[in-house]
Amino acid sequence: MKKLGIIIDSFTSITEDEFKKLEDFYFLPLQLILDGTSYEDNPSNDRQKLFDKIIQASDIKTSLPISSTIEKAVNESSQKYNDVLVLPIASFLSGTISVINVYAQKHKNVHIFDNHFVANTIVEIGLQAKKMYEQENKSIKEIITWLEEINTKTITFLSLKTLDYLVKGGRISGVKKFILTKLKLFPIIQSYTNNSIAGLKRTFKSSLEKIYNKLAEFIGGENNFKNYNLKLVHGPSKEMVDGAVEFFKQKGLEFSSIVLASTVIIAHTGPDSISISVVPKY
C-alpha cells in the first residue's frame, strides 16, 4: 500500500501526547528567542513556564527551525514514503517555507502546501490527506486540489487584549503606535492571504461581535455555520476563553476544538489573545 508522510511545525500547537499518537508525521520546531536565549518550540515544552518568560522578557523574537532539522526531515521522509506533504506555517508569517523548499526541490515526491490553517486544524488536514491518499487511493494532485478548496474556505480572526507584543515585535511604530496604545483598543486581526487589521473595538465583547459578523459574512450568512467547524486557539487567559465560549454559546454555536497556542504564537500575540476560525466540514 502506498504511504504518505507529513511534515508539520510548531505552529500546529500540538502537545507531546498528541504527537506520540501520530504515525508518519515529522515535526519541525520553530525557535523562540527571549532576551537573547533561544528555546526550541517543542511539544514536550512546559508552555506555562515559557509563557511566564515571554511576559517577563523585554526582547522577544522568533526564528525558523534549525536548517539541519529541516534537511533531515525532508531527506528521510522522501526516502521512506511514496509522497510527502509539508504543511508549514504560512509564508506571510514566516520564511520557514522558503528554507524547506531549498531541500524539497531535490526530491520530486516532496510537496509543500502554503496555507493559512491554524493549530490543530493543520494536523486534522494532514490526517485527512493521509486517509485520502492511502485508503481512498487519491493522487497527490487530487489532494492538493482538495487542500486548495479547504484553504480558500477557511479564515481566522484574532482578538488581542494588548498591543504591547505587536509593539515589541516592531509591527506598530511611531504615531500609530502612540495612538493605539493610548486608546487601549482591542485590535482584530484577519488572517487569510496575509495578516491585516479588520477592526478596532473598545471591549473584548464588542471584538467578539465584530469577529462573529465577519465570520458570518465570509461563509455567506449565519445559517451556514452548520457547514463549518468553529475553532478556538488561545493563550493562557482563562477569562478570554470563557468569554468567547459564552458569547458564541449565546449565538447557538459551540467550538469543535479549543486549543492552547504554542509559545511562538503567543510571542507575537501576547498571552491575552484568542483566534477564532471557521473551517469547512469534510
Swiss-Prot record:
GO molecular function list: lipid binding
Binding annotation for hexadecanoate: 63, 94
Role this protein plays: May bind long-chain fatty acids, such as palmitate, and may play a role in lipid transport or fatty acid metabolism.
Domain of life: Bacteria
Signal peptide: none
Provenance organism: Mycoplasmopsis pulmonis (strain UAB CTIP)
Cystine pairings recorded for this chain: none
DegV domain sequence ranges: 4-280
PANTHER family linked: DEGV DOMAIN-CONTAINING PROTEIN DR_1986-RELATED, FATTY ACID-BINDING PROTEIN TM_1468
PROSITE patterns associated with the record: DEGV
NCBIfam families registered for this protein in UniProt: DegV
Record keywords, A-Z: Lipid-binding
Entry protein name: DegV domain-containing protein MYPU_7660
